């Protein structure tokens, strides 16, 4: 009789922590039982612990808590902590580093996303040029902390060392790789029905011109698999290709729905074939019933309803952002195109304004990915994730700038948005706690929140937060003071008084302003 294998103390500790509900320990114990190296192989026990993991992470809230940069690009040291609310907005002057912060976050999110798609993927992109030129250590470190359901933290540290340094620092990847394996293994356990988080970055380059020919060629080259969950993670950090992916995916769904509809009815050719078989009306009726039953059996009503629901979700999300668009459809004649019904008229989506196209491309891509990543949710737009958007105000009319954040939060209520902007109108739609200002003093950087709250205020209050005058700086402070003095005198009905005339006479060259 074999003696039972002695269980090491660290394994006992993991089992105890797993029974107390710790996510990481539950997955580790599941792996122990599955691998059979530390514990005796027991698939049933492995699945038992994995069920606990799946229960926690399926459609779980995921958030970026903070990211720390060391000698990354212009920042020798910087820590970004996200707002407790769903949206955080980074502001600063041109060249202050807004995009750099978003890029650093995207590197960590992309590493997690790539590992969910491909197990044990150690690849991440860093260039030597991303190391701060004044770095004494000769290395850059980007350290990120994510939270699941506010209870479980996972950290990742990405490092790039210069070739010529002797003391190199290693990346710390294991926790993110473990989190990715949790999603993979749980999805296998749940027969591909588990919800994956949406992780995506939309850089400024997303505003490239959308062309119908490019989208059609892309579709012909790559026909999307509408049910492939990995499609929801692919190219999520390359904003330039997203609309073509959406076009291809939407066209594939539309084709399948049309095929289902075609099988709901009997064609003229089928009727002529039945008539050629017999003149007996009762027999013809029986044959028609048999044919319809056969077609109905061919159609998978569950699949059809699922696809129609997906299509409707996309259309509703676009309509939320561009209210005068009633419908999005695929047109096949005289050529393949995507069209919209706008104010009662059908128009190619590629002929809309740049602002409309930029917004539709962004919204449709987020919605498409959520639909793919959340196959079991009644409303997939309620899926969780983290989305980064650089210059959210890009090409948007001021009216849209005032509503974009609210619409993003209402349409995608469980997404954490981290945005950058130059628009004071955007800032008037969030609280001071949601705003992070890049502050530099003697080459040291900090992210600060404004002391005044711009929410619901005038744009002038937001301009003050951005340290920008509400009046164009075309005059000296002295001239601006005189202009205000003149305006005050006129408003009091003293346009003919000596002081008013003196200002007018002395500063005649500024007559256009006073």
From Swiss-Prot:
GO biological process: defense response to virus; DNA synthesis involved in DNA repair; double-strand break repair
GO molecular function, one term: ATP binding
UniProt xrefs under InterPro entries: AAA+_ATPase, ATPase_AAA_core, P-loop_NTPase
Keywords, in A-Z order: Antiviral defense, ATP-binding, Nucleotide-binding
Locus of motif ATP-binding: 92-99
Pfam name, any one: AAA_21
Function: Probable ATPase component of antiviral defense system retron Vc95, composed of a non-coding RNA (ncRNA), a reverse transcriptase (RT), this protein and a putative HNH endonuclease. Expression of retron Vc95 confers protection against bacteriophages T2, T4 and T6. At multiplicity of infection (MOI) of 0.02 cultures slow growth when infected with T4 but do not collapse, at MOI 2 cultures enter growth stasis.
PANTHER family hit by this protein: ATP BINDING PROTEIN, DNA REPLICATION AND REPAIR PROTEIN RECF
Name of the protein in question: Retron Vc95 probable ATPase
């Amino acid at each position: 009789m074999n003696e039972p294998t002695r269980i090491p103390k660290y394994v006992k500790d993991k089992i105890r922590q797993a029974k107390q509900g710790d996510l990481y320990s539950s997955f580790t114990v599941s792996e122990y039982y599955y691998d059979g190296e530390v514990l005796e192989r027991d698939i049933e026990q492995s699945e038992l612990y994995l069920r606990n993991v799946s229960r926690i992470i399926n459609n779980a809230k995921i958030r970026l808590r903070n990211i720390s940069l060391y000698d990354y690009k212009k920042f020798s040291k910087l820590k970004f902590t996200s707002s407790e609310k769903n949206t955080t907005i980074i502001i600063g002057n041109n060249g202050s580093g807004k995009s750099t912060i978003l890029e650093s976050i995207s590197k960590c999110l992309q590493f997690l996303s790539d590992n969910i798609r491909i197990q044990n993927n150690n690849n991440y992109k860093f260039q030597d040029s991303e190391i701060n030129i004044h770095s004494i250590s000769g290395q850059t470190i980007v350290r990120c902390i994510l939270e699941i359901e506010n209870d479980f933290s996972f950290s990742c540290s990405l490092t790039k060392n210069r070739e010529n340094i002797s003391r190199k620092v290693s990346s710390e990847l294991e926790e993110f790789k473990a989190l990715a394996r949790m999603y993979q293994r749980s999805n296998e356990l749940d027969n591909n029905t588990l919800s994956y988080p949406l992780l995506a970055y939309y850089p400024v380059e997303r505003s490239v011109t959308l062309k119908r020919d490019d989208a059609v060629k892309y579709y012909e080259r790559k026909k999307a698999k509408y049910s492939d969950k990995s499609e929801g993670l692919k190219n999520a950090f390359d904003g330039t290709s997203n609309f073509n992916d959406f076009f291809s995916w939407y066209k594939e769904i539309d084709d399948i729905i049309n095929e289902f509809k075609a099988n709901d009815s009997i064609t003229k050719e089928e009727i002529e074939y039945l008539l050629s078989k017999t003149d007996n009306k009762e027999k013809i009726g029986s044959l028609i019933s048999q044919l319809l039953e056969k077609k109905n059996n061919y159609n998978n009503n569950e699949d059809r309803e699922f696809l129609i629901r997906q299509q409707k979700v996309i259309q509703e999300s676009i309509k939320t952002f561009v209210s005068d668009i009633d419908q999005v459809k695929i047109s096949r004649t005289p050529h393949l195109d995507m069209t919209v019904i706008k104010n009662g008229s059908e128009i190619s989506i590629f002929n809309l304004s740049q602002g409309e196209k930029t917004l539709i491309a962004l919204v449709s891509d987020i919605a498409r990915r959520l639909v793919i990543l959340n196959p079991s949710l009644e409303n997939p737009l309620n899926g969780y994730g983290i989305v980064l958007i650089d210059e959210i105000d890009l090409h948007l009319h001021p009216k849209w700038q005032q509503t974009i954040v609210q619409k993003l939060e209402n349409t995608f209520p469980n997404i954490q948005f981290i945005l950058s902007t130059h628009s004071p109108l955007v800032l008037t739609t969030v609280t001071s706690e949601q705003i992070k200002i890049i502050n530099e003093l003697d080459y040291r950087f900090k992210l600060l929140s404004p002391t005044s709250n711009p929410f619901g205020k005038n744009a002038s209050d937001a301009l003050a937060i951005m340290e920008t005058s509400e009046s164009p700086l075309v005059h000296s402070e002295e001239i601006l003071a005189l202009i205000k003095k003149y305006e005050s005198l006129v408003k009091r009905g003293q346009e003919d008084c000596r002081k008013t005339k003196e200002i007018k006479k002395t500063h005649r060259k500024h007559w256009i302003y006073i």
